[in-house]
Amino acid sequence: MRECISVHVGQAGVQIGNACWELYCLEHGIQPDGQMPTDKTIGGGDDSFNTFFSETGAGKHVPRALFVDLEPTVVDEVRTGTYRQLFHPEQLITGKEDAANNYARGHYTIGKEIVDLVLDRIRKLADQCTGLQGFLIFHSFGGGTGSGFTSLLMERLSVDYGKKSKLEFAIYPAPQVSTAVVEPYNSILTTHTTLEHSDCAFMVDNEAIYDICRRNLDIEPPTYTNLNRLIGQIVSSITASLRFDGALNVDLTEFQTNLVPYPRIHFPLVTYAPVISAEKAYHEQLSVAEITNACFEPANQMVKCDPRHGKYMACCMLYRGDVVPKDVNAAIATIKTKRTIQFVDWCPTGFKVGINYQPPTVVPGGDLAKVQRAVCMLSNTTAIAEAWARLDHKFDLMYAKRAFVHWYVGEGMEEGEFSEAREDLAALEKDYEEVGMDSAEGEGEGAEEY
């Protein structure tokens, strides 16, 4: 088997974890107590969903997941919620005091006390796997636990499981909606620390998701539950190929092979379609061409940036539901002709396509409509550098005045780490700029002499 272990860190990670596992259970017909009436092979079996669930002898399906937070309230909701019987109590780890939106507390003082326990539990999960393929790590950039503890954990996972893939689902601080003033500090410190440890990071920007909920689902104002259910759909689309048998099965390494041209350029942009409410879906049937087109609308992206200003390096379309390759090829051909999609000149315009015949599932009573087909597009584009630029700018405004820095230094960080992290991100922006430059320019000048 090719198992994946999910690690949900901090409030954002845990709440997205709730949404994801709720959806996985519905998709696979697993009840909140872990029983699965449709599963014939009790206690083991080689079913595709075993990549995400382990089975006990009593026929109970347990998520291969770990929930970690430095303070107990959010994880307590899992302990008392609908799915409390699904998880083993040891999979839910909490500390006593939170990281107070402070990267240094999450990474150095408070995080340090709990990290060995977390690694021990991860080891137990890993021991139940026959062929662990990697980790999916869910966290936010802005929080103290999400930024500080995640980066500490990633460093340690690289030591213990050097060759295993590590994919991140990271919540990028929303440009307008902010939960903490120091989000830019935390984001830049965590990105700097995890850059070399993460193989691929899918960024989700809260504001982009807010806008999608407002515009497409008419929810006013959207709550975190609304946001997380939408994020859950996206994560489910990306992981569907690992959990179901599809026509094209993509494993974790295959994502990286197709999306990451250089180790540092590993932040694909995610777009999902269709996001429509039940009353709208009742009146329209969306064709493959329509949902494919929707993926190239900046309005459906999970991060605010404009790919029309950038260049694509790779593009991966993951369809699910009632979709046939013929329709997909036609839709993509149309897009290539009429859309202003620019690929970098060193990359042929290949679209990698995965099709999964399991139609998308929705949470009953949720906001999303049940649709026949959906698509999730992962594209590596230079436009995502705009997101880094925005963050760097905010960091600079605060750091120029050394605002709030004493809180970090007081927890044992050195001021040098700030400037080091900032330089690394400047280098990342530069990397994106260079990747998008035409490779032919250098050769052109020499050619005119002949």
From Swiss-Prot:
Q: Which family does it belong to?
A: Belongs to the tubulin family.
Enzyme Commission number(s): 3.6.5.-
State any GO CC term.
Answer: cytoplasm
What PTM annotation applies here? Undergoes a tyrosination/detyrosination cycle, the cyclic removal and re-addition of a C-terminal tyrosine residue by the enzymes tubulin tyrosine carboxypeptidase (TTCP) and tubulin tyrosine ligase (TTL), respectively.
Record keywords = Acetylation, Cytoplasm, Cytoskeleton, GTP-binding, Hydrolase, Magnesium, Metal-binding, Microtubule, Nucleotide-binding
Q: What's a Gene Ontology MF term here?
A: metal ion binding
Protein name as it appears in the record: Tubulin alpha chain
Q: Which residues bind GTP?
A: 11, 71, 140, 144-145, 179, 206, 228
> Which superkingdom does the taxonomy of this entry point to?
Eukaryota
Assembly notes: Dimer of alpha and beta chains. A typical microtubule is a hollow water-filled tube with an outer diameter of 25 nm and an inner diameter of 15 nM. Alpha-beta heterodimers associate head-to-tail to form protofilaments running lengthwise along the microtubule wall with the beta-tubulin subunit facing the microtubule plus end conferring a structural polarity. Microtubules usually have 13 protofilaments but different protofilament numbers can be found in some organisms and specialized cells.
* Function of the protein: Tubulin is the major constituent of microtubules, a cylinder consisting of laterally associated linear protofilaments composed of alpha- and beta-tubulin heterodimers. Microtubules grow by the addition of GTP-tubulin dimers to the microtubule end, where a stabilizing cap forms. Below the cap, tubulin dimers are in GDP-bound state, owing to GTPase activity of alpha-tubulin.
Query: Which residues of this protein are annotated with the site description Involved in polymerization?
Result: 450
Record Pfam families:
Tubulin, Tubulin_C
List the transmembrane segments: none
Lineage of the organism: Eukaryota, Metazoa, Ecdysozoa, Arthropoda, Hexapoda
Q: Where in the cell is it found?
A: Cytoplasm, Cytoskeleton
Listed under GO biological process in this entry are: microtubule-based process
